[in-house]
Amino acid sequence: MKFARLVAVTLLFLVVSGFTDCYKPVTNSGLPKHIKTVAVPAFQFEAKGIRYKVETRFTEAVMREVIRRGNGLKVQGTVEGADAVIDGNIRDFAFTGVLLDREGRARVYEVNIVCGVTIRDVKEKKVIYDNQNFVFRDSFEFSQDPRSFFNEEDPAVERIARAFAESVVSAFVNGIGVKDEKK
């Protein structure tokens, strides 16, 4: 009897104290309601030097991430018919040795990529998100044995592209840093 009364009082306290309001569902409230189709045109490579398909990897990573986390948003490569456009550019690409072995050869390399992204609302004709200084780093190690050599630069670029896409799409879909119009 005492235990049942204690449980009832505890439950009543929890309900009255407002603990039921602690849960807030995650929604895509950061996006304007009219945005249903997002265009992701090919990113531009503005960095010095030539890197094979870096901009393509970033474009594809963003498209995959919008499909994965966009709550039903349609993705296309062309601007025509889109409600929003994600424009991106690779502003800098640096590949440097950061740790040397006993012979003075680089064993650990670091890839630094600086990207810019602008997300525009086509219907309202305004910028809803802009960050021209996304900086991503990843490191990888070369094998000492030349027979087991595998170029780790490509997987490192893929990891950076995925991290970039996750950041951009998260900011876009969740409304983090989305520019609000002052009233």
Roles of regions detected by a PLM:
Residues 8-18:
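Bacterial N-terminal signal peptides
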